[in-house]
């Protein structure tokens, strides 16, 4: 490959040769654009829209449109896209990932493809990692878009429904990945189409694309409601787990991030919980709580994986070091950590709707992304998202010096050397950014520097609010900044003149991350736009990466050299061993994400079917034919499942059939066994169907056609939502235990697909049964007024937005009847409580 690259150039270089002629055309139009009057810019936008309506393609107008944006940016915000930024814009428009180094002006680059793709009127989403960046980027670039006659909006966490609809109705919408994803899920939970906020997913430009599509890929978006299980057992399991002895009662697998009981531990569990066989299926609940308590106590680390703030457990993002407010670990792990730390144990939540970022972003017609570091994950982008990575050349050559790693025998020796290095460089006024892997490590280093009298600022999850401000000062003369991993990403570090003369920004990595990309991101904070700078990583054999994944050869070499604690080695062999350990972990993580996607694809196909049908119900008012089909299916399936054809059991089967249908749609004693005992199966079906249809026709006349159609819609939507929520839970439980199928020589993914498909068919049938049951049992004096129901079922975007709001209707329903809202509860325990 190396020789071929030398002859033909890398893939990126070959692709850039194709882009260059387009960029030449854009630059050639510069003079023409300069001659335009200010008022001409909006007219040009209208002209482009008209040309597109007449059949021209976006690519036909691209050179002129890009040249127009370039001049508009120059006139409004004083910035003119340089050649490399124009290249980046073309790459993004083509639906690719542009790798652009820190400080190359990604925010400005996005204006080019955003403008061109917004001309179709179908909307463009520009995605960033947090609210601060979304608002900042919108505010910076809004003058450009507005000068061109486009409307620009931003989605922030605290917006209400109307504000969201307005923002999504804009030509270009800025927002965070989580807000876009949650809005999609909420849109598929509404009862009236007027409540939906998003339009169709057209074109998305994802900033920090590696962070969102790879680092976040394993974290599903979940809208949840309060579960009903008690939390007491988490405390019991925690008490038991704290009595265990490491290695004797349980073992820890650091590679898999899990802990397991040994045989001795199992014996202790059986004695403690007073069960005969811990592994028995009926003890699954105990196993589940013990596994989570083990993980909470012996795998999850405080101030690394999570932190405590105001008596609440907050997850710490392993890639950014940010506290993830509002996020909770699923499957009871969060509750287990709460029990471990002695804070209030919240109830386990029930999933109402969920999707992964992988599947959300794959729904866009066109997807593109920008980041400073994507090449190491090129295979994953191509395989999962169909995106290729093009490395965009920098405007100025990179002047940063990347030094070789220095390796120490112990962590203590390493940190002593880091402090010495900081003190030395501080004396000459060189600014430093020191990257740590956890809050705990950053605070330890901070206290060591305090003892040495070195003033510094600390940036980690605990000081999240000041993030952008702290990072913006990191390039000043003599400034020392300690930051967990990638905190402050998206904010430029600009050097002062004195800092530049002192050698530029020095990056010190206190540990190698398991991903080369994260290390490259840290390095990339220095040397922006040709600035001077330097970087070096300090590594010890006690670091997690070296301990868990490093080879024994390195340990052997260090032992032979007989290194003292504070002596270091710089060796190419050690550096390449570190890199191969990282590649091993990256490959392992990619495989995990790929397997998770195979599982998620099963429920994703089911989600698409449910949401598509749900959308059709929202759009079309008249469900008469669908409801009639459901009534027929329920009646026919009941006959088929109750009558076996065995003559001796015929009378009993008929009685069971009548009882079953009386629970769903037949009034008591309307059909007697003797009336149908002499009929064939087909005749029984016809007779029962005729009786049921007559009852429903009478109900329709009694309530009125318009009102019954409205009730059908609301009840069907509620039943679909309730059954879908239960199905998500069932699929999750299936997935938890499916890995064990490998012991039976079964492919777990295939088993999940097959059984998941059967469960889905069963859910579809249960939707029909419950819809028919509620429609036959509901008696309404007054039809639900659209506005009233819309108000009562609207999605709120405050902290309680995940709670399911029951529909209130003026019904004549018995207190012990099933509630017609579709919750599956009795009326007295559901909407009846509100009456």
UniProtKB/Swiss-Prot annotation:
GO BP annotations, alphabetical order:
intracellular protein transmembrane transport; protein import; protein targeting; protein transport by the Sec complex
Q: Which InterPro entries has this protein been placed in?
A: Helicase_ATP-bd, Helicase_C-like, P-loop_NTPase, SEC_C_motif, SecA, SecA_CS, SecA_DEAD, SecA_motor_DEAD
Q: Which residues bind ATP?
A: 85, 103-107, 492
Question: SMART domains from the xrefs?
Answer: SecA_DEAD, SecA_PP_bind
Q: Which PROSITE patterns match?
A: SECA, SECA_MOTOR_DEAD
Name where it's found.
Cell membrane; Cytoplasm
Q: Does the keyword Electron transport apply?
A: no
* UniProt cross-references to CDD domains, sorted A to Z: DEXDc_SecA, SF2_C_secA
GO molecular function per UniProt? ATP binding; metal ion binding; protein-exporting ATPase activity
UniProt name for this protein: Protein translocase subunit SecA
- Top-level taxonomy: Bacteria, Bacillati, Bacillota, Clostridia, Eubacteriales
